[in-house]
């Protein structure tokens, strides 16, 4: 019954490592051997007890041999003590072995617990890694989407670059055209400057003739001869309707040069208006009608006016050179506008 703790510990050790099992098997073998030795010793003791009984029975017969028997008994007692001492030593050895096995079992349990904690920690690490893998997969998917978007944008940019290259070629071609146009414009400007000089001289001559005509009409004086106006027959005076329409254009272009002549004309016109009230109607009313028609309706003031020819009735052919030189001004403005627009675009 003293070996019961070992029997209680044996069913608790199936979870140990194979090394512990081997140790237990060795211990069990040793215990079996010890039990066998004990059984043999017990048998021997029983035999000795039987022998003692037989000796006691035979004491009477062996009184003579008491001394020899005593010596034998003492020997047997000594042997029994020795056997008891041996049994005690064996029990102590078994107890020490049981303690060692219990300590080993505790160590194995500690290792098992440590392994369990490590397994739990590693499982947590695995879960964390799985979560990180999921997040990385999501990031990869988003990165792939962004890569697709960037690829589409790069394709668009490449298409735009191709368009810009073609646009550069077109711009170079247009620049060459612009250089040609600038050269043509320079030539046209030179020609227009020459034409403007001729036109200014013609306008001055026409203004002088108009002034003379107006002064002669308003003051009932005969007009000067036509030879003083122009030498060429092609450069004849325009009719008053054309003169009235063209005078503002010429005045707008030559304001700084002809300010003094304009002041003189205004003073002369005011003086003539005071003399003849019919001229105010010519200036204030319908500008489209010629002044000669309005002047006819007014009665003649002197007899000399009837005999003298009326200058307004003389309708001279328009100056063809003035009209021809007036037309190139519009292309000039259009060319200048086109050049300015193309410069802004560049």
Swiss-Prot record:
InterPro entries from the UniProt entry: Luzp2 (IPR026718)
Compositional bias segments (type: Low complexity): 250-261
Chain segments annotated as coiled-coil in the UniProt record: 16-211
Domain of life: Eukaryota
Positions of region (Leucine-zipper): 164-192
Region (Disordered): 221-240, 248-346
Basic and acidic residues: bias regions: 286-298
UniProt GO cellular component terms: extracellular region
Keywords: Coiled coil, Glycoprotein, Secreted, Signal
Extent of the signal sequence: 1-19
Biased composition (Polar residues): 262-283
Primary location recorded for the protein, binned into one broad class: secreted
Cell compartments where the protein resides: Secreted
Glycosylation site list: 133, 264, 302
Protein name, as recorded: Leucine zipper protein 2
């Amino acid at each position: 019954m003293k070996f019961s703790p070992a029997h209680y510990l044996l069913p608790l050790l199936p979870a140990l490592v194979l090394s512990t099992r081997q140790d237990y098997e060795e211990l069990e073998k040793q215990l079996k051997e010890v039990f066998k030795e004990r059984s043999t010793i017990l048998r021997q003791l029983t035999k000795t007890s039987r022998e003692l009984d037989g000796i006691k029975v035979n004491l009477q017969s062996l009184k003579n041999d008491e001394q020899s028997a005593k010596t034998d008994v003492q020997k047997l007692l000594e042997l029994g003590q020795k056997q008891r001492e041996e049994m005690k030593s064996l029990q102590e050895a078994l107890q020490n072995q049981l303690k060692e096995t219990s300590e080993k079992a505790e160590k194995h349990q500690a290792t098992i617990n440590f392994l369990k904690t490590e397994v739990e920690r590693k499982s947590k690490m695995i879960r964390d890694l799985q979560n990180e893998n999921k997040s990385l997969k999501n990031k990869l998917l988003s990165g792939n989407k962004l890569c697709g978007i960037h690829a589409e944008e790069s394709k668009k940019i490449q298409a735009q670059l191709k368009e810009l290259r073609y646009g550069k070629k077109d711009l170079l071609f247009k620049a060459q055209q612009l250089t040609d146009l600038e050269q043509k414009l320079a030539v046209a400007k030179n020609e227009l400057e020459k034409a403007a000089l001729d036109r200014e001289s013609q306008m001055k001559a026409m203004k002088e003739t108009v002034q003379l005509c107006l002064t002669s009409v308003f003051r009932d004086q005969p007009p000067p001869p036509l030879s003083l106006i122009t030498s060429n027959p092609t450069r004849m005076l325009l009719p008053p309707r054309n003169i009235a329409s063209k005078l503002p254009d010429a005045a707008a272009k030559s304001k700084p040069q002809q300010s003094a002549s304009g002041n003189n004309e205004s003073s002369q016109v005011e003086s003539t208006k005071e003399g003849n009230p019919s001229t105010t109607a010519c200036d204030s009313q319908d500008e489209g009608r010629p002044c000669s028609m309005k002047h006819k309706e007014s009665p003649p003031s002197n007899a000399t006016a009837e005999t003298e020819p009326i200058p307004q009735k003389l309708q001279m052919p328009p100056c063809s050179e003035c009209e021809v030189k007036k037309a190139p001004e519009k292309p000039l403005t259009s060319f200048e506008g086109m050049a300015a627009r193309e410069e802004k675009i560049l």
